[in-house]
Regions:
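Structural motif
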Residues: 1-2, 24-26, 45-46
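Short, well-ordered alpha-helical microsegments
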Residues: 6-7, 30-31, 50-53
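Short active-site oxyanion
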Residues: 19, 38-42
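A short beta-strand-loop structural module common to alpha/beta enzyme folds
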Residues: 17-29
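N-terminal beta1-alpha1 ligand-phosphate binding loop
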Residues: 1-13
């Protein structure tokens, strides 16, 4: 919910120049719906699932990953960083491609790993929506 709250705050602050979809569950990622909507971008903040290659090839999919990529590629990045004793990391924004967390990186922003997991995720969400990949104006749509 904190992700959607921050997405809605960001939406209210910006005029629409691009249509962007923010997906928060795997059930929302339906190619037929995407084909009807034809988004300019699809943002995947805190996404835990593989994105189907058909969607990656057809749309500009931007993933936000909670490590200083290429370090930490793969699943459970927050848990893996904490287990390894890290106290800070970076949020990396990258274009999805057919390889896991390996596309071109557009942005990196510092993220403290101090506090509870909830506090860390809330800070990460604020970074994602306050420092977007393309600092123009966006319009967020939910499917």
């Amino acid at each position: 919910t904190w992700n959607i709250i921050n997405a809605n705050i960001f939406k209210e602050k910006n005029k629409c120049k691009h249509d962007i979809i923010i997906l928060s569950s795997k059930d929302e990622l339906i190619e037929r719906k995407l084909d009807e909507f034809r988004p300019d971008y699809i943002f995947f903040p805190h996404w835990s699932y593989l994105i189907p290659n058909d969607i990656v090839k057809k749309y500009k999919c931007i993933i936000f990953h909670m490590t200083d990529l290429p370090y930490g590629r793969g699943g459970s990045p927050l848990q893996n960083l904490i287990v390894r004793g890290h106290t800070s990391t970076k949020i990396s924004a990258l274009m999805a491609n057919e390889d896991l967390d390996a596309g071109p990186i557009y942005m990196k922003a510092n993220l403290s790993l101090e506090g509870t997991a909830q506090e860390i995720y809330e800070r990460a969400s604020k970074i994602i929506f306050e420092e977007p990949v393309n600092p123009g104006s966006f319009c967020f749509h939910h499917i």
